[in-house]
Amino acid sequence: MKLLAVTVLLLTICSLEGSLVRRQVEEQSLQSLISQYLHIVTDYGKDLVEKAKTPELQARAKAYFEKTQEQLTPLVKKAGNDLINFLSSFMELKTQPATK
């Protein structure tokens, strides 16, 4: 009976130690995966900064913003005029009943 109890105790201890070792390995692999991911993201960010410094990209971005501004300016002016007309129609509605 004592032999059986000692055997069960040893098996339990070995099982617990094995699971502990597996957890430590999983944590280390997760940490290395995260550090590798952060390293890749950092390198990618550095590459983007270097590419953004090129004059060609800056010229393309400037041309894009100028083109967008040219297209949006008339739309914004029209929307402003429409809003003023809309609000003034409400003002006219309020003044009509007062004059009667």
From Swiss-Prot:
Residues 1-18 form the signal peptide. Keywords: Cleavage on pair of basic residues, HDL, Lipid transport, Secreted, Signal, Transport. The keyword Cell membrane does not apply. One of its GO terms (cellular component) is spherical high-density lipoprotein particle. One of its GO terms (biological process) is protein stabilization. Gene3D superfamilies: 6.10.250.100. It is found in: Secreted. InterPro entries: ApoA-II, ApoA-II_sf. Monomer. Interacts with NAXE and NDRG1. This is Apolipoprotein A-II. The gene is APOA2.
